[in-house]
Amino acid sequence: MAYFTIIQGDATDDMRHVAKIAIMQKMINFPSGLKLVFVPNTAVRSVAIGVFVGAGVVRETPDIAGISHFIEHMVFKGTKTRSSFDIVNEIDSIGAQINAFTAKSYTCFHTVSIDTNADKCADVLSDMYFNPAFDQEELEKERRVVIEEINESEDTPDDLCLERLLCNFFKGSQLEKAILGTKKTLKEMNSDTLRAYHSRYYVANNTVVSVAGNLTEEEAVALVNKHFESKYTNIASESMDCDVAERHAHSTSVKKKKEIEQTHIAFAFPSYAYNDERGVAMQLMTIVFSMEMSSRLFQSVREKLGLCYTVYGYPSAYKNNGAFIIYTSTSPENAEKAVRAIRKEIDLLLEKGVSEQELEKGKQQLKTSLVLGQESTSAMMRTFGSHAIQTGELYDFDKRIAQIDATTSEDVLKASREIFDFSNVCASIVAKDDDVDILSIMKDAK
């Protein structure tokens, strides 16, 4: 059980109002290797269910790049007993919601409903997980849909800029591939390709079912046993551990000319892997430096200098790898000024670190975001499910809160100096005129 202490009002005020919120969570390991992560909440009437499968970009070879995401689409196109309409109609008929997403390391299918309809949601998710039809005619149609999704991404400059940045930054590792794949690889896939990948990775010891909401532990276990555990016909013997290669150090830029009004700019610096304990210091640095409207980047580059509408930075963490990303978009004539302004704020951070007041603000924001996440069963399902599929462990709120409280301004400064390595930064620009050398400006500006 975890307790969060949120202090309301001035941190120096002796009259503090303290609220404690208890979270009970549990991981159940089934004989097949399947894991259930359960987070009860009797204060709500909803139940969120997520099926997390360790199938993402990191599992794909270059010739099948994008297959994890393609399967995410195809399981909605029908099972052996349900048509694509049946799937969504059954969910809509009970007022529930169903969706899915693919990340670099995993795929997730999830629902949210009132508690009395949790069994129906689990039944639909189970059917999609175990029995996708992979009909070739439906595959041909959905292939066109995903290609249009790629076209849409390529027509969205910020998406294009960031995707090209990460593919270049992680060049040489499994993470360099785009989640959507390429038009070429998609055109070469057929039903047999999808079935082979599905049969290999949609197995018990590569799956976590995450349940959050108004169920008892006994009800959650019975639900998962009925719709998942009892349906596995054999226990997979192959280890599902995925050894993701560390990124090769390099500092390069990618450029894309596009007839657009603004210049889109992004940088990536090497940072910490998922579950690295230094990640808390990085998160606190992110809040102070680049994430919120009161952050240094926002206040300087947008509010004081008026050089852009959008500027932010955030960490992206994976197994054995991580990137800290900074993005902005501005008019061509302001591109160099914006990069210099960003570099100036980085230099100030590296020289002076964060103040105690900024650190306390960051801690309050980070703890508050964790606590408020409890109020959404969907958020809790995602937090616990994504952590379990990536680490095999239960997310420890007590530990995270203790880490936040224990982090010092010196820890944040040390993390900042480890992350902002200008000899190892990569850049991406999408613009009508890509002649500006943003990488050199970032590396050399003073």
How should each PLM-predicted stretch be described?
Residues A11-V18:
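Short hydrophobic alpha-helical segments enriched in small aliphatic residues
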Residues I21-S46:
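N- or domain-start disorder-to-order transition segments that initiate the globular core
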Residues Y3-F4:
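Aromatic (phenylalanine/tyrosine) cluster motif
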Residues P40-I91, L165, F267, E277-F289, ...:
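Active/ligand-binding-proximal structured segments within catalytic/core domains
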Residues N41, G50-F52, A236-R296:
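His/Glu-based metal-binding/catalytic segments typifying zinc-dependent metallopeptidases
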Residues N29, P40, S84-S237, V244-A245, ...:
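Charge-rich, well-structured scaffold segments of protease-associated domains
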